[in-house]
Amino acid sequence: MINQQAHEKMIKARSKLMKGQLGMASMLLHLDLVEVSADQCSTMATDGKRIIYNPQFVLDIEEIEVQSVLVHEALHVVWEHPLRRGKRHHKVWNIACDYAINGFLIYDLGFELPEGGLWDRNYMGMSSEVIYRELITNEEALQDAIDTMNEGNEESNEGSGESGEESGEGESDQESGGESPDTGDQESEDSAPVGKPEQSMTGKYFSSPDEKTGEKVGDIDLDSIPMPSGEVWDAQDDEGKPLSESEITELQQEIQRAVSLADKLEKAMSCDGTSSMGGRMDTLKEVKVDWKDQLNDFL
C-alpha cells in the first residue's frame, strides 16, 4: 500500500508546476510516479519512464523542494541521461549529470538546490560526458563534489543518524555498478545556458582509454562515494532488465515526442514565444561530437 500523504504531496507539487513551468510539468505527466522503500532509493530517481521516490524523503522536505527535485528529474529525462551512461561508473555519472543540469535549474528555471546540491560555474555549458571525464581524471574535482554532498547529508541527517546512501544502503540492484544498455547510435548533448558549449561524447563507444573506468580515482574509492539527491538510473524494462536495442530506440522516440510537445506548450503560453526547455529541440537537430571522442571510438 502506498503512502497516501506522500503521493498526494507529489501530485500537488507536480500540479503547481503547471502555473510557472508548463514544459517541465508536461514532461512529468509522461512519467509514472512509483513509490519504493528506502533500501531501493533514499531520495528520488528516474529511469526515463518513471519517477521513483522514497515517501519519507518526500514527507521530510518542503513542497517547493519537492517541485525542485521533480524538475531536476525531468531534466535528466529531457537530456536522456538514463540512456547515456554506457560503461561509466554509475556514481560518478550521477555527479556529472547533476553538474550538467543544475546550472540550468538555478539560472533558467529559478529553482534553489537542496543542501548538498551540486553546482559549479566551471561546468556551465558542458555536457555530462565532458564533466565525467574531468571528474574521473581529476581527484581534486571529484573530492570537491563529494565534500559538497557530504556537507548536505550532515545537515539533512542531523540528529537522525547516518543516511542510507552513506552506509551503502538505498541503492537499487542496477546501481551496483553494472553497465547500462548499448545505446546504439544515439546522439544527444546537454544544452549550454551560460558560457561556451563543450562538445558531447555520445553513441555506443562510451568507454574510452582516457576515462579510467576502474574502481579508484587517486585515493578515492568510487563505490564508497555518496549518491546525489535526485538520482538518474539506467533505463530498464518492467522486470528491471536492460533495454533491448529496439526498446532503447522506442524510449528515445517517446522522450523526443514528449520534449517536442513540452516545447510547443511553453512557446504557445509564453508572451514572447520562447521556451525554457534549454534549447533541447535545437540539440536534437544538430549534434556535435568532440574530435577526441571520435578518435577514441576507433582506438
Language model region names:
Residues G103-L299:
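Negatively charged
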